[in-house]
């Protein structure tokens, strides 16, 4: 069996495993009657808000594709494992390729803790499609290096926005010193890691501080898109008002979800539990479920439409 066939098998194995897991989550969800009752009693304006949230899903995915393409194409060379530089010509990712890889990576994300499988999944698809041009020994070091940078910059953006939000509107957390210790440790590790990234990763990829700053900016754009989606779903379920304190709670919610240890089987429950804590409404838990369907389930299904024939 050649490498390309092996990667093709892995590609479909991940897709089928993710579909099985998503099906399990849908079948075992126990609150369909209450969720249906909440949806059935909504006015047309609330349905419109849900529709806008769904419409923002492809925008969200396009932002992540933009972010991933920027990371991969961030400099003029593609370094191999032995450190030699190779000029990039046709080896740059197109937006279409990055877009397809981002959709596929959602499948791996739902079956791995903290969605750690997303960037390796992009490597699987990239290797499957570009094996002849690049070779797996040149793709994987860069995928893993840029994946580490991408994960760190996204987390840094969430912490960067979430900490001021807590300080402005998080009295219930301000009194809890353990949360501040956890957030402080995470922030310190992120700052140190990103500061050292150009030196630590130079054998595998050219990572500049300019690229890191650009990725943080793109991550903030994606976070804002998430917050708008969450606000729309919460408002549709009568669990949100567009007040400054409520808006800051959106950033607090994503910070808490991000720093909470999580496994795939408990992800929906964790998101729902934090939604109740932050927004103070049982309907907020349903908002977390609906947003999971919109931003996780739909993109997973979307890969079957965007995949390369």
Question: Language model features by range: what are they?
Answer:
Residues 1-102, 151-262, 281-309:
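Predominantly cytoplasmic-facing regulatory/coupling regions of multi-pass membrane proteins
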Residues 8, 61, 115, 268-269:
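Hydrophobic transmembrane-helix microenvironments that flank and shape a buried ionizable site
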Residues 78, 90, 99-128:
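Extended non-transmembrane interhelical loops and adjacent amphipathic helices
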Residues 98, 102, 133-151:
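Alpha-helical membrane-spanning segments of integral membrane proteins, especially the hydrophobic core
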Residues 108-110, 251-272:
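Transmembrane alpha-helix interface/packing and boundary motifs in multi-pass membrane proteins
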Residues 112, 116-117, 148-156:
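Membrane-embedded alpha-helical core segments of multi-pass
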Residues 118-127, 263-279:
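Re-entrant/interfacial helical elements at transmembrane boundaries that shape
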Residues 129-142, 282-290:
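Membrane-interface alpha-helices at helix entry/exit sites of multi-pass transporters
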């Amino acid at each position: 069996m050649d490498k390309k066939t092996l990667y093709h098998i892995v590609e479909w194995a991940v897709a089928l495993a993710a579909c099985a897991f998503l099906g399990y989550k849908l079948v075992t969800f126990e609150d369909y009657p209450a969720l249906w009752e909440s949806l059935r009693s909504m006015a047309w304006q609330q349905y419109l808000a849900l529709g806008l949230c769904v419409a923002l899903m492809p925008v969200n995915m396009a932002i992540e594709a933009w972010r991933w393409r920027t990371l991969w194409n961030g400099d003029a060379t593609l370094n191999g494992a032995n450190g030699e530089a190779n000029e990039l010509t046709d080896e740059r990712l197109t937006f279409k390729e990055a877009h397809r890889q981002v959709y596929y990576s959602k499948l791996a994300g739902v079956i791995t803790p903290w969605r750690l499988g997303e960037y390796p999944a992009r490597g699987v698809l990239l290797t499957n499609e570009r094996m002849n041009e690049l070779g797996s020994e040149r793709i994987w070091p860069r995928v893993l290096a840029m994946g580490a940078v991408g994960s760190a910059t996204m987390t840094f953006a969430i912490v960067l926005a979430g900490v001021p939000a807590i300080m402005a509107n998080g009295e219930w957390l301000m009194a809890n010193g353990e949360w501040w210790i956890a957030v402080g440790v995470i922030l310190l590790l992120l700052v140190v890691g990103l500061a050292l990234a150009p030196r630590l990763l130079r054998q595998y990829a050219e990572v500049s501080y300019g690229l890191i700053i650009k990725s943080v900016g793109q991550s903030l754009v994606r976070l804002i898109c998430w917050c708008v989606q969450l606000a729309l779903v919460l408002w549709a379920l009568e669990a949100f008002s567009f007040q400054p304190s409520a808006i800051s709670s959106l950033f607090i919610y994503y910070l808490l979800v991000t720093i909470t240890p999580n496994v795939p089987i408990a992800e929906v429950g964790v998101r729902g539990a934090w939604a109740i804590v932050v927004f103070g409404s049982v309907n907020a838990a349903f908002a977390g479920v609906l947003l999971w369907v919109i931003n996780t389930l739909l993109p997973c299904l979307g890969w079957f439409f965007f995949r390369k024939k």
